[in-house]
Amino acid sequence: MSLKLDGKKLSLEIEERLNNYISSNKKIAKRAPGLAVIRIGEDPASGVYVNNKEKACSRIGIKSFIFHLKDSVEQKEVEQLIIKLNSDKDIDGILLQLPIPKKFDEQKLISSINPGKDVDGLNEINIGKLVKNEPAMRSCTPAGIINLLRSQNITIEGKKIVVIGRSLLVGKPLSLMLLNLNGTVTMTHSKTLNLNKVCREADILIAAAGKPNLVDSTFVKEGAVIIDVGIHRLKSSNKNQTRLCGDVLLEDVISKVFAYTPVPGGVGPMTVTMLLVNTIFSWQKQFGLSSTLNDLLP
């Protein structure tokens, strides 16, 4: 039977440890950690994600500040808000909820976030430090994936790892993080020739293509570990209902794989948990608190 990498269960376990960590250090810091989330526009999925982050913060004692801006707001106004939050001593982390309306210069906004408060790890300073394998904020989804693998003692070093997707949010930082952990990494994308053949070489296959049910049994070798980053809402056979699926056609591959992540309940919860970890890391650094935070992770 294949091993389910249960991100929801692991995230709750880590949250409990984080809650205890905050409680034991709050008297020294004299305040709770603070996370500012900037949402622009009315994208429904963004609303759900921001709500999930707000609830997660509340569960463990992080104070969240939600800034929901209309899509009529100007670039300069968003930049000014970020500058204000950069200097706000009650804010440890700043997150720009993506995607944002196309009229905005997304990278310029991300670049204006103080690297020490860039809890999404997307500022070029943090990306540069990742390239150099120096300590810095790490992107949440890649960090969540690595902790999921570690939680089940799945070795990265020396393994052939194929990543499908080259986004700045997942594919690129994840490939660098795996490389820094001595994995043998191949990054693939929409122009890769014979994609399923390349993927069949993988000991660990990570699907972050953003394409529903792309990965079937022809992509997977016996005994592989498969991580599904995708999440899509599709119409079910009953037209009035929808169902969630990932980039992996799970029912087609499950008999071949050693371990897999479900959708939902796999990578998603761990992404939110690593956002909490990054926020607390920034809080810890500001107040010179106990450096045992890494001991709370797998």
From Swiss-Prot:
Name the CDD domains for this protein. NAD_bind_m-THF_DH_Cyclohyd
GO molecular function ontology, one term from the record:
methenyltetrahydrofolate cyclohydrolase activity
What catalytic reaction does the record list? Answer: (6R)-5,10-methylene-5,6,7,8-tetrahydrofolate + NADP(+) = (6R)-5,10-methenyltetrahydrofolate + NADPH; (6R)-5,10-methenyltetrahydrofolate + H2O = (6R)-10-formyltetrahydrofolate + H(+)
Gene Ontology, cellular component aspect: cytosol
| EC number(s) recorded for this UniProt protein | 1.5.1.5, 3.5.4.9
Q: Which cysteines are joined by disulfide bonds?
A: none
- Please, which domain of life does this record's source organism belong to? Bacteria
Q: Which GO terms describe its biological process?
A: L-histidine biosynthetic process; methionine biosynthetic process; purine nucleotide biosynthetic process; tetrahydrofolate interconversion
Question: Does the keyword section mention Zinc-finger?
Answer: no
| Its biological purpose | Catalyzes the oxidation of 5,10-methylenetetrahydrofolate to 5,10-methenyltetrahydrofolate and then the hydrolysis of 5,10-methenyltetrahydrofolate to 10-formyltetrahydrofolate.
Quaternary structure per UniProt? Homodimer.
**What HAMAP family does the record point to?**
THF_DHG_CYH (MF_01576)
Q: What is this protein called?
A: Bifunctional protein FolD
Species this chain originates from: Prochlorococcus marinus (strain MIT 9215)
